């Protein structure tokens, strides 16, 4: 097999998905975004499973990866809708943190060009509340950075889905050929035994 096969391409794509998911996982941990952390963790596990299935010629593992990519695309479309506030969703809710904390996206305060300034608390507030943090000068708003992350994940998943389907179809054809070869060998072996007798 040459290096430009669908299998090699899927291996490279899975490796790229792992790097991308790990990068996203780090920034979600920094922002205490528990729902995306859980999703990224599951994604990393399934991509490793798909990578293993591709390397070891295990089409069932690749099928699990294929089903997961459809779910992963759905999750990332939801994240895009969440940050763009489509369909009644609001990026200012605590949905991504499971309503555990008031943390938001790490990019909200640390995006490119952002200047973070802590304002003095009022008499009624507490210092750890995010309403006392002022962020100015951002080159790109945080919600667009999150949308870009999700769009990259969708693109990688869609390409991965196509390659995974291709590798599964090739694997199934090879299994059919192999089982046919076994039947031919069995038939020839029986004929040889009959000739010897």
UniProtKB/Swiss-Prot annotation:
Segments traversing the membrane: 2-22, 35-55, 62-82, 152-172
Subcellular location(s) per record: Cell membrane
One GO cellular component term noted in the UniProt record for this chain: plasma membrane
GO biological process: regulation of sodium ion transport
Signal peptide residues on this chain, from the entry's feature table: none
Keyword Transmembrane appears in the UniProt entry: yes
This protein's record includes keyword Cell membrane: yes
UniProtKB keywords: Cell membrane, Membrane, Transmembrane, Transmembrane helix
Pfam families: NKAIN
Disulfide bond entries: none
Major site of localization recorded for this protein: membrane
InterPro entries: Na/K-Atpase_Interacting
Membrane-protein topology: Multi-pass membrane protein
Complexes and interactors: Interacts with ATP1B1.
Family: Belongs to the NKAIN family.
Protein name (Swiss-Prot/TrEMBL): Sodium/potassium-transporting ATPase subunit beta-1-interacting protein 3
Organism encoding this protein: Homo sapiens (Human)
Lineage: Eukaryota, Metazoa, Chordata, Craniata, Vertebrata
């Amino acid at each position: 097999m040459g290096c430009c096969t669908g299998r090699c391409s899927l291996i490279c794509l899975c490796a790229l998905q792992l790097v991308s998911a790990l990068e996203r996982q780090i920034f979600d941990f920094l922002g205490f975004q528990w729902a995306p952390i859980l999703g990224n963790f599951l994604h990393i596990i399934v991509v490793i499973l798909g990578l293993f299935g591709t390397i070891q010629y295990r089409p069932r593992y690749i099928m699990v990866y294929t089903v997961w990519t459809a779910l992963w695309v759905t999750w990332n479309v939801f994240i895009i809708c969440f940050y763009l506030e489509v369909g009644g969703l609001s990026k200012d809710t605590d949905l991504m943190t499971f309503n555990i904390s008031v943390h938001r996206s790490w990019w909200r305060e640390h995006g490119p060009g952002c200047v973070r300034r802590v304002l003095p608390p009022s008499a009624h507030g507490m210092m750890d509340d995010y309403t006392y943090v002022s962020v100015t000068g951002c080159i790109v708003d945080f919600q667009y950075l999150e949308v870009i992350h999700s769009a990259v994940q969708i693109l990688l998943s869609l390409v991965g889905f196509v390659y995974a389907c291709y590798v599964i179809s090739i694997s199934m054809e090879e299994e059919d050929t192999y089982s046919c070869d076994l039947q031919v060998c069995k038939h020839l072996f029986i004929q040889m035994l009959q000739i010897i007798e």
